[in-house]
């Protein structure tokens, strides 16, 4: 029966997954191609105009003048977040309240199947789908880095006679040379950020399943999860507005989604990629947690929400179909 439930949830979600997979694979690739058409140092005057907004950025704005920094923004792009959240909210809220709303839950539970098996099979399909979507994002980044080159300004060299010193020639203008991106950026620097995106999706998915397990109407479950996310986003923005508002930062789970900061840390210190704690190198309270620490926080939130959902669904009395 477990295999039949797996097939049922695969059939229900395959079209949505394929549509999102198409976007999440090609968007990073196209974005990297677009970025690679420009020499980044030319954007320095533009970046200076946004210095007043630097407090809202997860890293110093100068980071966006580096190729690993500008590519890392992919994980904060609205398109990427919208696709991942669409999968998590749409599929998470469907498992209980969706079936009740459609009047199909009674028919499903009339079969020789435990309630926990319904949630477990749905979780397996949905979490696997989320993992594959995140892998496709990384695959798009990997191919974008390995199939594109970018113009880089390089000065001609001048060798001083007798001294055998080589210096930049001040009498000739800098020349533009196309350099493969894979010589400037290492794809493995984005592994932790990809895991952070997966953990964010898992946390939202857990919240969706938990809301669904308590409710009868899917539209209300969707509204609850979106409200929680928007409230967390507002608290996150508020916490960055002024130092006195920093007290709100621990109150939002979005504080644990830090892909740009992770990429910066890993680029400068590759050995810290798998750190749970970064306290010995921390310059602020945010840096006391390592990349895997942030991933673990979101994963624990998702597991806690799933645990509540399993408990509630196995204990509740199901309402009669409308």
Could you describe each region identified by the protein language model?
Residues 12-13, 30-71, 167-176, 221-227, ...:
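Terminal transmembrane helical anchor/hairpin motif
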Residues 71-98:
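Long, hydrophobic alpha-helical segments
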Residues 89-109, 123:
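Transmembrane helix boundary and interhelical loop/hinge segments in multi-pass membrane proteins
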Residues 88-92, 206-207, 253, 308-309:
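Hydrophobic/aromatic residues in alpha-helical transmembrane segments
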Residues 1-25:
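Aromatic- and glycine-rich beta-strand/loop motifs that create alpha-glucan
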Residues 68-80, 120-216, 290:
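Secretory targeting signals
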């Amino acid at each position: 029966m477990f295999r039949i439930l797996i097939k049922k949830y695969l059939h229900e979600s395959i079209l949505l997954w394929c549509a999102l997979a198409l976007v999440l694979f090609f968007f990073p690739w196209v974005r990297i191609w677009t970025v690679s058409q420009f020499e980044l140092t030319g954007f320095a005057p533009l970046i200076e105009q946004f210095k007043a907004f630097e407090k809202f950025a997860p890293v110093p704005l100068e980071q966006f003048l580096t190729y690993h920094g500008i590519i890392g923004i992919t994980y904060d792009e609205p398109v990427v977040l919208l696709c991942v959240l669409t999968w998590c909210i749409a599929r998470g809220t469907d498992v209980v309240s969706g079936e009740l709303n459609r009047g199909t839950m009674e028919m499903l539970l009339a079969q020789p199947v435990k309630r926990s098996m319904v949630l477990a099979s749905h979780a397996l399909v949905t979490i696997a789908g989320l993992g594959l979507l995140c892998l496709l994002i990384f695959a798009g980044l990997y191919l974008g880095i390995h199939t594109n080159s970018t113009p880089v300004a390089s000065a001609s060299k001048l060798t001083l006679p007798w001294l055998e010193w080589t210096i930049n020639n001040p009498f000739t203008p800098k020349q533009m040379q196309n350099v493969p991106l894979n010589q400037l950026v290492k794809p493995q620097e984005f592994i932790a950020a990809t895991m952070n995106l997966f953990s964010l999706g898992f946390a939202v998915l857990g919240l969706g399943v938990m809301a669904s397990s308590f409710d009868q109407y899917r539209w209300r479950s969707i509204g609850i999860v979106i409200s929680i996310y928007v409230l967390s986003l507002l608290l996150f923005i508020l916490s960055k507005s002024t130092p006195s508002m920093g007290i709100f930062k621990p109150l939002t789970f979005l504080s644990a989604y830090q892909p740009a900061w992770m990429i910066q840390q890993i680029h400068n210190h590759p050995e810290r990629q798998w750190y749970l704690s970064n306290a010995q190198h921390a310059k602020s309270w945010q840096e006391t947690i390592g990349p895997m620490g942030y991933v673990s926080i979101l994963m624990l939130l998702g597991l806690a929400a799933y645990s509540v959902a399993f408990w509630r669904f196995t204990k509740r009395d199901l309402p009669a179909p409308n």
